[in-house]
Amino acid sequence: MILYVLPTSLSLCLLLMIIYLLTANLFKFASYELKTPFECGFDPLSNMRSPMTTRFFILTVLFLIFDVEVVLLFPVLSMVSFMTSPLIIMSIILFMMVLLIGLLYEMYYGVLDWVLN
């Protein structure tokens, strides 16, 4: 079996490398600006101590909070069919309500609005 897999995978790798080398010159970018790195809207060659807007910081913190909460919910929600205790179900509902209230609070005070009206 390995005698068939090894030559097949090597020939596939070689074929893909040849295709890449033949087509790499077809997609050259004319603009120098397209080749420069783009990182959070800042010029990488500018002063690194320039102040960052608080909107980036708030958005990052909110993303981390909701990301951690979603990661915590995945194992719990996968076990819902095995749970029969009302205490566990009520704790899940309470956790979801806290998430929903936090999201509504942020929407009400305009934290999630990127462009101010």
Curated annotation (Swiss-Prot):
The keyword Membrane applies. Its main location: mitochondrion. It is found in: Mitochondrion membrane. Belongs to the complex I subunit 3 family. Core subunit of the mitochondrial membrane respiratory chain NADH dehydrogenase (Complex I) that is believed to belong to the minimal assembly required for catalysis. Complex I functions in the transfer of electrons from NADH to the respiratory chain. The immediate electron acceptor for the enzyme is believed to be ubiquinone. Pfam families: Oxidored_q4. Keywords: Electron transport, Membrane, Mitochondrion, NAD, Respiratory chain, Translocase, Transmembrane, Transmembrane helix, Transport, Ubiquinone. Disulfide bonds: none annotated. Coiled coil: none annotated. It is a multi-pass membrane protein. One of its GO terms (molecular function) is NADH dehydrogenase (ubiquinone) activity. The keyword Electron transport applies. The chain crosses the membrane at residues 2-22, 56-76, 85-105. This is NADH-ubiquinone oxidoreductase chain 3. It comes from the Eukaryota. Its EC number is 7.1.1.2. It catalyses: a ubiquinone + NADH + 5 H(+)(in) = a ubiquinol + NAD(+) + 4 H(+)(out). GO terms for cellular component: mitochondrial membrane; NADH dehydrogenase complex.
